Regions:
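Peripheral (often C-terminal) accessory segments that flank ATP-dependent C-N-forming ligase machineries
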Residues: 38-135
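Conserved metal-phosphate-binding beta-hairpin within the catalytic cores
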Residues: 1-26, 54, 72-75
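Short hydrophobic alpha-helical module
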Residues: 15-22, 34, 43-50
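Gly/Ser/Thr-rich active-site loops/lids in small-molecule metabolic enzymes
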Residues: 26-42
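Short, exposed beta-strand "edge-strand" segments with a Pro/Gly-rich flavor and a Y/T-containing core
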Residues: 17, 29-33, 97-103
Length: 135
């Protein structure tokens, strides 16, 4: 983030073009059918070869993601069993993550609200922030 001196507004500044982290690419694919990694590669080839890039058909569903550190090394997510779950984080110890997808925005919001409460009470781990930043 940077502060615009003339207005005092805080704005986000991206320093490079890339596919986002934190499994957001998987969430985008769940909602749109677009694999950002694949399309990035196709776009790079198109630019390098001077050919036209065409975006594939986009699905207009809704998706959401929840990710948290956990108290458990390998948390059991079996009690999250809704059919809207399209992805589960399984490769990172001490983490829980789920992506849900539906054509209903209300359903996604309802699931995320429910999951946030359940993750907070049954899984979430955090450490207090230090009094001052470490160098």
């Amino acid at each position: 983030f940077i502060k615009v001196h003339e207005t005092g507004e805080i704005v986000f500044l991206e320093t490079s073009s890339r596919v986002g982290g934190a499994h957001l690419a998987e969430m985008v694919e769940a909602s749109s059918g677009i694999n950002l990694w694949k399309e990035w590669a196709i776009l790079e080839v198109a630019v390098a070869t001077g050919t036209e890039y065409k975006l594939p058909a986009v699905r207009n569903d809704h998706a959401g993601i929840i990710v948290s550190l956990t108290r458990q090394e390998w948390p059991d997510t079996g009690n999250f069993n809704d059919p809207e779950i399209t992805w589960r984080m399984q490769s990172m110890s001490y983490h829980i993550g789920l992506i849900v997808q539906s054509d209903s925005e209300a359903r996604i919001l309802s699931l995320l609200d429910d999951y946030a409460q359940r993750v907070q009470s049954d899984y979430h781990a955090s450490a207090p922030a230090p009094d001052k930043p470490s160098l």
